[in-house]
Swiss-Prot record:
Gene: rplO
Entry keyword annotation includes RNA-binding: yes
Compositionally biased tracts (Gly residues): 21-35
Protein keywords: Ribonucleoprotein, Ribosomal protein, RNA-binding, rRNA-binding
Chain spans, region Disordered: 1-44
Protein name, entry field: Large ribosomal subunit protein uL15
GO BP of this protein: translation
Function according to Swiss-Prot or TrEMBL: Binds to the 23S rRNA.
Domain of life: Bacteria
InterPro entries the record matches: Ribosomal_uL15 (IPR030878), Ribosomal_uL15/eL18 (IPR021131), Ribosomal_uL15/eL18_sf (IPR036227), Ribosomal_uL15_bac-type (IPR005749)
GO cellular component, one term: large ribosomal subunit
Entry's family note: Belongs to the universal ribosomal protein uL15 family.
């Protein structure tokens, strides 16, 4: 099979109904919109308007707070780092944030990169990142490597 031979399954995309094309079509004249009124005209309804009743979004109390300067980290799991090391896309000798971005493992750094412990990790690697979970640090040291966190390095 070639790309130009690909076809939708029969009935996968039903024929579009052409509205307002005469009485014989079954969807002529009003085109299924009924008679007059706001809904028959273009623009349809006003979202969130409940006919004068206090709308839901006003009935419920305001709650919570969004921190305007909250740090957003790019998250990477150890299992994925291991895959990239096995594939030869990452050098286990020294893994930095820049090398993670260059390898395509992380799209962009954001406010830093945080390593989490999901997945198997067996490589003896030296990793330097902005943040890491305790279990990730343990997993790397158990494999014989070292995971340094930028905040700890700055404190020393």
């Amino acid at each position: 099979m070639k790309l130009n031979e690909l076809r939708d399954n029969p009935g996968a995309s039903p024929k579009r109904t052409r509205v307002g094309r005469g009485p014989g079509s079954g969807k002529g004249k009003m085109g299924g919109r009924g008679i007059k009124g706001q809904k028959s005209r273009s623009g349809v309804a006003i979202n969130g308007y409940e006919g004068g009743q206090m709308p839901l979004y006003q009935r419920l109390p305001k709650r919570g707070f969004n921190k305007p300067n909250a740090k957003k980290y790019a998250v990477v799991n150890l299992g994925l780092i291991q895959k990239f090391i096995d594939a030869g896309k990452l050098d286990a000798a020294s893994i930095t944030e820049d090398s993670l971005v260059a390898s395509g493992l992380v799209r962009r750094k954001l406010d830093g990169i945080r390593v989490l412990a999901k997945g198997e990790f067996t490589a003896k690697a030296t990793i330097a990142v902005t943040g890491a979970s305790k279990s990730a640090v343990e997993a790397v040291s158990k494999a014989g490597g070292a995971l340094t966190v930028a905040s700890e390095a700055a404190a020393e």
